C-alpha cells in the first residue's frame, strides 16, 4: 500500500484559511460507507441524522498558545512551537532557526507581545531527536506564561499570521483540558445551541481527551505506508466514558466519534483491552495507533470529520473506515463541488462500511 494511493489534486483556493461566520454554517458531505452513495447537506442537517440514544464522543482538549517568537541571547532569531508541556516550567518544543541551539543556550521569547526587554527567558536543557527540552526560568506556571506571550499555532497550510478571532474560533466550544497544539477540527462546527438541540433530542454525549500534537501535520515520509512510524499523542478515556459506550452498544444504538482524534482515543482503548477479552476499558497513556485500510474499528459506528490533506494518515484513517474507493470518490466529488478543506473547512458524516476490508487500494 503506497502513499501515492492516497493522493488527490486539491486547488489552492479550496483550502479554508478563515472560518465561516457561524460555526454551523459549514457544508456537510454525507457518505454512506456501505453503499458508497453521498449527499450534499449543511452541517445543521446533522440533527436529522443522529438518533435518540446515540452517543456522540467529543475530544475536549484545549489548544494552548504554543507558538513563541524570539531570539537567542546572542541575537539569532528563532521560532518555538511547544509540542508538550512536561510540568509547570519544562516543555518539549520544535525550534526553527538558522543554527540549532546547544544545551545551556538562553532564549528570549515573546518580546513581540510583552515588549522589548520584557521577554520570557528559557534555557535549552537537552535535545530529544527533533524536539528540544526547554526550562522556563520564571516562577509563573508555563500555561500562564503562554497565555501572555504565545500565539495560537495555526496549521502551516492556513498560511497567515494568527489573528485575535482565532483565539476563540480555533477552539471547540466545549474545550476544557489544556494541552493541544492543534484543534480537533471536526468539533469546531458545533455551537452551544446545536449541542442543546442534540441533548433535547435525547442524544447522549461523552468526552475523551487527546492532546493533538504538531505531528498531525507531518507528512508520511516513506512510500510504503506500512513502514510509517506514527507520532505519539497522550489520550484519556475514563471509566465513565467506557460505561457510556458499553450501555450504548447494549441498547443497540450507535457510537458516533466527532473527529479522528476521538476515533484514535476510543480505538486505542479498545485495542489495549483486547488481551483481556473485554470490549473496552479505561485508557490513560500515549497512543501511536495507525488506522489505515485493512485495519478494523471495534467501537466507532459513525464518524464526523473534516476533509484531510492528500497522502496524510488522516485520509488513510477515513479510507479504512469508509472503504478506499468510497473515500476517494467522495473526495473527488468534494473537490468538484468546491467544498472547503482542512481545519477551517467543511465536514463529512460517514457511516462505517462493514465491507471496508474488501475495499483496499
Curated annotation (Swiss-Prot):
A GO molecular-function annotation: S-adenosylmethionine:tRNA ribosyltransferase-isomerase activity
Superkingdom assignment: Bacteria
E.C. number(s) listed in UniProt: 2.4.99.17
Iron-sulfur in keyword set: no
NCBIfam families associated with the record: PRK00147.1, queA
Gene Ontology biological process: queuosine biosynthetic process; tRNA wobble guanine modification
Native organism: Haemophilus ducreyi (strain 35000HP / ATCC 700724)
Identification of the protein by name: S-adenosylmethionine:tRNA ribosyltransferase-isomerase
Assembly notes: Monomer.
First-level EC class: transferase
Any Gene Ontology CC annotation: cytoplasm
Record's function text: Transfers and isomerizes the ribose moiety from AdoMet to the 7-aminomethyl group of 7-deazaguanine (preQ1-tRNA) to give epoxyqueuosine (oQ-tRNA).
Keywords, in A-Z order: Cytoplasm, Queuosine biosynthesis, S-adenosyl-L-methionine, Transferase
Endoplasmic reticulum in keyword set: no
Alphabetical list of InterPro entries matching this protein: QueA, QueA_dom1, QueA_dom2, QueA_sf
Record's subcellular location: Cytoplasm
